[in-house]
Amino acid sequence: NPMKKEKGLHSRNIHLQEYNFDALIKDYPSLASFVKKNKYDALGIDFFNPNAVLTLNQALLAHNYKVIDWSVPKGHLCPPVPGRADYIHYIADLLAEAHDGKPPVGTKIKGLDIGSGTSCIYPILGNCIYGWKFVGSDISSDAINHANKILNSNPTLKKNIKTRFQKSAKHTFKDLIKSDEKFDFTMCNPPFYSSLEEAKNASSRKVKNLNVNKVKKGHTPVNKNNP
């Protein structure tokens, strides 16, 4: 069945199409138990189920980027891969301005992610999509340790991404960047929600508002399996 494009994503984002669940399940079989047909006869997952959301994003990373053993600790928010990939593509657009209008690729480009978190998602996607090197910093040693477990399972990522513990929460760059070190860009994208509960409430409001607008326009309401 034809897959329509998602609105709002960058033109280079490979997640422009709706999820191909058959392909995702083939590469990540554990996703199968979360995929159901909704009342509109479309495949989807329950986006209010944290385990389903995590497994979907694990499948996206495995299928599209060949990343294995990626996870976030229980109780932590799961970053949506398509949106995080978008962020990387827009950084590439900014870098392109200094590279003859073309997004630069390869390890000659080095980025610094302030607050890379447990998932290390931006360095991972930046390396997978454009081949950039990264340093990811965090003020949480638990976050650094978890990120390192992911990197250790993926040799290419481990080679190109390094994590650093920032001892002082008051400082961003101090005692983090080495004296002879240069970065092409730095980035910082703090979490949008402080807890899973806050994220769930925001998601519920989003679906409710979408349904109100769709009904007003005479369209089919949104089901929570496909918001």
Q: Model regions: which residues?
A:
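Mobile active-site "lid"/loop adjacent to the S-adenosyl-L-methionine
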Residues: C188-P227
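Conserved alpha-helix/loop element of class I SAM-dependent methyltransferases that forms part
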Residues: A59-N64, P82-K110
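S-adenosyl-L-methionine
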Residues: I139-C188
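N-terminal auxiliary segments of SAM/dcSAM-dependent transferases
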Residues: N1-C78
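Extended hydrophobic secondary-structure segments that form protein cores and membrane-embedded regions
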Residues: H76, K110-S116, T163-F165, T186-M187
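Conserved SAM-binding motif I beta-strand of class I
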Residues: K133-I139
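Conserved SAM-binding loop of SAM-dependent methyltransferases across substrates and taxa
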Residues: T118-W132
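Conserved class I S-adenosyl-L-methionine
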Residues: P104-G117, V135
